[in-house]
Amino acid sequence: MLLGDGRPNSINISAQGNLLPNPRETSLKIFPSKNYLDPKWTLNTMQWGQILAHDISLTASTSIIDTPSPTCCNNEGQYTSESDSNRFCAAIPIPRTKNSYSADARQCFDFVRTVTTNDTGCTAAGAPSYPINENTCYLDLSLIYGVSDNQSKSLREGKGGRMLTVERNGGVWPPQAANAQETCTPSIPANDTCYVAGDPRINQNPELAVLQTMLLKEHNRKADTLSQMNGRWDDDKIFQETRRIIIAMYQQINYYEFLPILLGRDNMLENKIIYEDPTDYINDYNNEISAGITNEFTTAAFRYFHTLIRGRLDIVKENRNLERTLRLSDWYNRPSVIEEPDAFDGLARGLSYQPEDKADQYFDEETTQYLFRGNSTKGSDLRAIDIQRGRDHRLASYVALRRYCGLSVPKTFDDLSEYISKSNIKKLKSLYKLVDDIDLTVGGALEKHARGALMGPTYLCISLIQFYKIRTGDRFFYENGNNKNIAFTPSQLATIRKGSSLARLVCDNGINIKSMQPRAFELVSPKNKIVPCDSLPSVDLSLWKEKKQKKTGDNK
């Protein structure tokens, strides 16, 4: 597969022509399996980050060019015949080192390369080839509504503006997949619980499924209210207006509640990504700015937050006592657990009560030793995959991105000491021949955090640019009032700003959740106490009630 440099087999060769270190070895040495809990932020922060990531990015698979996806390395960790013959194969070799499965003779981790513009015939002769993103670049909840009219229609009920759902086990759930073995995993019965949504990854882990289900239920709650208030509205009018409201609430949560945690509120204010207590429209749409998702953001900077993942998921009672704990790798692509009695609400409470792992260089072993293990005793390594994906996408080096961001540029390994620890510099020296060879996925993850942020200066630079582009490159962004035909009224915008929060979303869409702390991304504390759900602000939908038109000749 030809990428930007025109070489078919250069995935592990640096721009300087040096052999790059084995991704699995790099993962083990630089990103070992340890757990340090975040002292302030809940697991919601990690999980909402995955919601956002899945909304704006989906690595293109071979299905878009009508080609079956190859198996490059099988479930037993052995190379297949396709490994050498299929151009999309780039299986990750497992080195014979301690803690690297050498005892059970596993040879590799499966890895399938991303489909590029060259593969689809969209690259001119001699031009660079780029990896394809199957999702839209806008914060438009495509993971709920889909990315096309046809997909959206297939997910709609067709009446009352509602989305399709099913009722069973005392709850309301996303539609059931026709064949769970094909959609979720071959290791479960064909009729087992497995969901269909706007994004195919809804089943990936239980807490992702919980939050996506809540967003789906929120749409139908709002649609029912609008339908009751506005009897003359047809199905499509209700659907489109509900979708517009839900997306606006979601954008408000992202920009004013979630992203300040990752990027730092002051950093966002300084870069005009948010504004101080806005009361009016923010008309910053620029038709010359593309909201497109950069390769550096989606393939490196935002994947850094895989470090936040916890390998044990708490199911928590209403009184916040622990009921039980799930092992993450038991439930990859097996969402049935969320339909067990009290599990849906219990996992939602757990997301809001359990701390996430700290943003650091350490990863939970459930993601680096047991990823997607199915019924096997061992699995894959998410961090090794992240490193390999960066090379697959031909990311510029860590040093190149520091230069692009206007940061100090190291010429030697020792020059890194200003922002990377000496112990990590020593590890980098043992893996890379030159400082210019360091992967962006690796170097950026080792930087000391920038002021107010949960990431270092290089990733912060990339992320600030990205989220500025997403808001200013979207003419439908909820705070934009330039076009009165698509803008919210001032009073509607005000209630969206006041009544949109993750806490309210969880309260309204649990099965029997009675209480929540107001700032659900933040751990419970004396300044963030658990309160009754009814006390939390909500969006006032009466502001969408259509005014009755006067009859002709009626002067009253």
Task: Outline where the language-model segments fall.
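Terminal regions of secretory-pathway proteins
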Residues: M1-P206, D224, M229-K556
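Alpha-helical bundle segments that constitute or directly flank the non-heme di-iron/ferroxidase center
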Residues: N205-K217
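Hydrophobic faces of stable alpha-helices that mediate helix-helix packing
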Residues: L216-N220, L395
